[in-house]
Amino acid sequence: MEPISHLVKSSLPNYLSSLPVPDSIGGWFKLSFKDWLALIPPTVVVAGLGYTAYLAYCPAARASCAAKNSGRCNNHIRKNEPKVVDMIDVEDIAEKAAFCRCWKTKNWPYCDGSHGEHNKQTGDNVGPIVIKK
């Protein structure tokens, strides 16, 4: 318990009092590069705490996180149907056709390259199914 007491009563107040926080708005423009570097760690801590509080207490943030972590693949294609199934006759394919597997395409069931952006954002490697005649 002694180390925590020392941190709260001595180390942290000494650190905060040594930060180069100016008294006026004009003082911010007179800070040196070294002063700006000294202000980075507390700024990162405050921003991290603010972001954590935002995720914890903002309903919009919780809803978007829940949607991303739901495990659902299809987020917008024919949601009124219990199961999305497309039957395509091989005889109707001219030479080759690329079919979507990532559910991001706007031209369902054909691939329009939307998986490229998905792969960049998530580090995934999904691609289309290509059928040749």
Curated annotation (Swiss-Prot):
[2Fe-2S] cluster binds at C100, C102, C111, H115. Its cofactor is [2Fe-2S] cluster. Keywords: 2Fe-2S, Endoplasmic reticulum, Iron, Iron-sulfur, Membrane, Metal-binding, Transmembrane, Transmembrane helix. Its main location: endoplasmic reticulum. Residues 59-133 are cytoplasmic. Belongs to the CISD protein family. CISD2 subfamily. This is CDGSH iron-sulfur domain protein. It comes from Drosophila melanogaster (Fruit fly). The gene is Cisd.
